[in-house]
């Protein structure tokens, strides 16, 4: 089958004009691209779709086509993308989009650009129904509210909810049938979706399950949902690990000894650690874990121990810089799990103070920070009391 999509981006957007500063909703910026681009890329990624015709209002056609060409040059979706001028009514815009389809097109999906969150599963459900022989297919959702028929301010009937459905796009059609339905319709017959024309033509229309997230941007309050849903955050995890040797007068290292700090908290009476900075092994591991959440490299790359500027630098500075860089890349930290591995000193007397200090450095509450301490049962260099290790695991969300 040759399945094409007609993407309608020709609406006037009058209900949103004031809230959007006069910008038509199909041209609202979402992640640096106009709203219609998000829907276009969803169809372009579908293996069922052979091409897309984008319908713009006549007054927008030239500029929008030039803008679209620029987006296609930068990130071509890999299938033909054509444009057409819209008409006075929605059905006129659809008709013009149908006229722009290539001769090989046999099936068509009609979609409103004001539904930018159409997903691959919904497109596939409509396409599969067409491939199975259905000639008119629409996605629907159950109506959960009680629906009343009214005349002015008076209720005239309560409609049976189980017989009602909320309709979405994309709506799929056999192209020949849809063209016949358009040709059959009276000039004064106005419709709000294409399935209505097919119904009026006397042909059956079938349904597939819609998608709740496939909302239509219509009212000013929808803009908040648009901003939140435009770039849904993805879960991320960062891992950090660090080691420091203890100072030993019999075996001095290349780096100077520093009083022990863990999580920015001084550990009095503990062995000194060898370090270029202040040697806070826990904050070093945590800094690496934060950087790991955003593919930001590691602490040694950002703060090399060969740089004298970092001599005895407080590790909280490293963590603060890493947090700024990570937040600039869209990171929100939700939980931190920390482990200190050492034979000495004993961590439990200091654990709560360390935990609270780390939470403060991260801007989290203490329930979002877990701290554990363990030994290696006398094994390895920590078991021999020659050093200390720390492991950090950071969980969060990142907006693309």
Swiss-Prot record:
Coiled-coil regions listed: none
InterPro entries named among the record's database cross-references: IspD (IPR001228), IspD/F (IPR026596), IspD/TarI (IPR034683), IspD/TarI_cytidylyltransf_bact (IPR050088), ISPD_synthase_CS (IPR018294), MECDP_synthase (IPR003526), MECDP_synthase_CS (IPR020555), MECDP_synthase_sf (IPR036571)
Function, in words: Bifunctional enzyme that catalyzes the formation of 4-diphosphocytidyl-2-C-methyl-D-erythritol from CTP and 2-C-methyl-D-erythritol 4-phosphate (MEP) (IspD), and catalyzes the conversion of 4-diphosphocytidyl-2-C-methyl-D-erythritol 2-phosphate (CDP-ME2P) to 2-C-methyl-D-erythritol 2,4-cyclodiphosphate (ME-CPP) with a corresponding release of cytidine 5-monophosphate (CMP) (IspF).
Residues annotated as site: Positions MEP for the nucleophilic attack: 161, 216
Pathway stated in the Swiss-Prot or TrEMBL entry: Isoprenoid biosynthesis; isopentenyl diphosphate biosynthesis via DXP pathway; isopentenyl diphosphate from 1-deoxy-D-xylulose 5-phosphate: step 2/6; Isoprenoid biosynthesis; isopentenyl diphosphate biosynthesis via DXP pathway; isopentenyl diphosphate from 1-deoxy-D-xylulose 5-phosphate: step 4/6
Protein's recorded name: Bifunctional enzyme IspD/IspF
Region (2-C-methyl-D-erythritol 4-phosphate cytidylyltransferase): 1-235
Binding-site positions, 4-CDP-2-C-methyl-D-erythritol 2-phosphate: 242-244, 276-277, 298-300, 303-307, 374-377, 381
Pfam families: IspD (PF01128), YgbB (PF02542)
Enzyme Commission numbers on file: 2.7.7.60, 4.6.1.12
Any GO BP annotation: isopentenyl diphosphate biosynthetic process, methylerythritol 4-phosphate pathway
Source organism of this protein record: Solidesulfovibrio magneticus (strain ATCC 700980 / DSM 13731 / RS-1)
Site residues by UniProt (Transition state stabilizer): 15, 25, 276, 375
Cofactor entry: a divalent metal cation
Keywords: Isoprene biosynthesis, Lyase, Metal-binding, Multifunctional enzyme, Nucleotidyltransferase, Transferase
Residues noted as binding a divalent metal cation in the record, renumbered to the chain: 242, 244, 284
Gene name of the encoded protein: ispDF
GO molecular function: 2-C-methyl-D-erythritol 2,4-cyclodiphosphate synthase activity; 2-C-methyl-D-erythritol 4-phosphate cytidylyltransferase activity; metal ion binding
Reaction equation(s) it catalyzes: 2-C-methyl-D-erythritol 4-phosphate + CTP + H(+) = 4-CDP-2-C-methyl-D-erythritol + diphosphate; 4-CDP-2-C-methyl-D-erythritol 2-phosphate = 2-C-methyl-D-erythritol 2,4-cyclic diphosphate + CMP
Region annotation (2-C-methyl-D-erythritol 2,4-cyclodiphosphate synthase) ranges: 236-400
Keyword Lyase annotated: yes
Family: In the N-terminal section; belongs to the IspD/TarI cytidylyltransferase family. IspD subfamily. In the C-terminal section; belongs to the IspF family.
């Amino acid at each position: 089958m040759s399945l094409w999509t007609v993407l309608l981006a020709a609406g006037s957007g009058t209900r949103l004009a004031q809230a959007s500063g006069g910008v038509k909703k199909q041209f609202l910026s979402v992640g640096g691209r106009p709203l219609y681009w998000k829907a276009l890329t969803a169809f372009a990624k579908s293996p069922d779709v052979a091409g897309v015709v984008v319908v713009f209002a006549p007054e927008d056609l030239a500029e929008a086509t030039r803008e679209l060409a620029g987006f296609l040059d930068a990130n071509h979706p890999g299938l033909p993308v054509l444009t057409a001028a819209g008409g006075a009514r929605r059905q006129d815009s659809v008709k013009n989009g149908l006229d722009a389809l290539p001769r090989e097109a046999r099936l068509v999906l009609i979609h409103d650009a004001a539904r930018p969150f159409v997903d691959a599963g919904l497109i596939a459900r409509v396409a599969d129904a067409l491939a199975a022989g259905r000639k008119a297919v629409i996605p629907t959702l159950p109506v959960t509210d009680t629906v009343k028929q009214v005349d002015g301010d008076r209720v005239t009937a309560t409609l049976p909810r189980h017989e009602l459905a909320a309709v979405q796009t994309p709506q799929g059609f056999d192209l020949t049938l849809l063209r016949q339905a358009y040709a059959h319709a009276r000039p004064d017959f106005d419709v709000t979706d294409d399935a209505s024309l097919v119904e009026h033509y006397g042909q059956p229309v079938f349904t597939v399950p819609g998608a709740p997230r496939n909302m239509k941007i219509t009212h000013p309050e929808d803009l908040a949902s648009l901003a939140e849903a435009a770039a849904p955050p993805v879960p991320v995890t960062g891992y950090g690990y660090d080691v420091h040797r203890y100072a030993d007068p019999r075996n001095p290292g290349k780096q100077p000894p520093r009083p022990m700090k863990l999580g920015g908290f001084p550990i009095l009476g503990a062995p000194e650690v060898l370090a270029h900075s202040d040697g806070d092994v826990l904050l070093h591991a945590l800094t690496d874990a934060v950087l790991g959440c955003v593919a930001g490299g590691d602490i040694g790359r950002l703060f090399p121990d060969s740089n004298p500027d970092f001599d005895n630098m407080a590790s909280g500075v490293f963590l603060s810089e890493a947090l700024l860089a990570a937040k600039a890349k869209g990171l929100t930290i939700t939980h931190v799990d920390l482990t200190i591995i050492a034979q000495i000193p004993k961590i439990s007397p200091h654990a709560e103070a360390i935990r609270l200090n780390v939470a403060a450095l991260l801007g989290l509450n203490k329930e979002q920070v877990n701290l554990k301490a363990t030994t290696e049962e006398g094994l390895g260099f920590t078991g021999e009391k020659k050093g200390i290790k720390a492991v950090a695991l950071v969980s969060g969300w990142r907006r693309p």
